[in-house]
């Protein structure tokens, strides 16, 4: 008895010191509405286990290892405070006080952490644990009984009136544990009957969580044998709609075995949820630091060498430099800001040889923080099933695009997709959201419902180009053959890169020699170079670049704005093509990404030049050449295997820079007022 009194005294002292007592007073003021009379009143109390242990170790141990008993202690103290301070007349018994303890954190020890990869999961003490995982499925919000009032059927029993028999939901309890018709009065043993008009309902949502490493299997390759299994979270009341499919969360919850005869399900009652993103910002490797110092005299050389040396195990140098640069820019630019705004850069590759490029894109996918390789036979966005935990509502499962949230979704060969699937992908590319239709009759609802989910990933696609008779290679690249995909689809993609059609037999021979060398001497470096970088070096570089915060210089902004206006007018006059506002976003994304890849924090005019060249090549592939005459591989116009080649490339890019300025002055009158002539 003395120990119980001491614990309650510690609870009262903690509530007073932490502000919980004042919050109780404020919450009770909201209950004084005479129109609202309930059987149970819910109070949320935030508890910090570290502070509790410091105040009273016994109470801290009770909260961490026996939360149900701790809840009863807080309930008793809260009821005593309500009656002593006369906070409300609506609460007559302690049973009407429904206290929910919200954990702010847990001690950073293994016994308070649940690894979602650990097996088997057996019944243990119902105490809070912390876990991290990705949301892969969620249900619609349904109702559950938060609390109910029962009256004794014996009129002579004092429990036939008042609020003596109150049942509230407890973690791990089913609906039948809270409300059913076989409860017995504690005083006279007569049957109890629910007073339905006092039933209090709350919101409930089921969510499936899985270890983030499980998504590595979907990159297209896997190492070792692992077993991954999702865990079901029960979200209640204010936690409903607090998560999004595809996002990574840190959850504090209480594991429980839910009995639904004849089955028994292991699940977790969520207590608190917070968005969790690993804040890793690795340093750039010494090799890249050395390269950065060596190329400091030119704003273009660092990114050129980084792209040139990328993926040498899969393709010989100089063969797909533009594509490799585009993939690196997409990796760097794909990120979510602190304000939850998402930045993406979609890449569509047009080629006549898809095998090598598919391998190169798959290898690039391994550098992404999260990368999903979609199978044409699988679900791209969402799928529906019936919930298996008794709710009977629709369970929405994430497809490849939603699982790739914050990363890259690789579509592979678009020739494998049917027209309706391509139309759906095009719609998502344009709106960055996907709608899910839920038929009400099928899933136990009165009305149909349509939900919308944001799609926050970059898409990589591949299409075979058709060979046109009579077509010859020239310095000016015309409209590309996009194979089975419509022109509107390519327009929605943004950046389009053509590979393989102009390099001819020489490139085929180089690729064949490279493949044979790698097969006969795997792991060796077939092209000795002063600059050699490992896959880990590239992973660290991409991760570091993603975290860089950049600002747009006035010179870069003016060049981008001037090119957009000039290109829009030139193409409208000569081709009747209207350049959309999406081109501005593409130009800014390319310029920012190139700035980051060069490890700068200020977007220079030279970054804007690279963005303009890539964008102009992309628009040319879709709509044909314009008055701005640039070579097909404008960013890599010459071989750069040595210092002389790098210098020659700088000179060509300087000339192209001047061509862009002349194009702007010609087709955007007035541009000379804000762009300084060089």
Task: Name what the model sees in each region.
Residues 1-40, 345, 358, 382, ...:
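Long, intrinsically disordered, Lys/Arg- and Ser/Thr/Pro-rich regulatory tracts
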Residues 560, 569-585, 596-678:
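C-terminal engagement/docking regions of AAA+ P-loop ATPases
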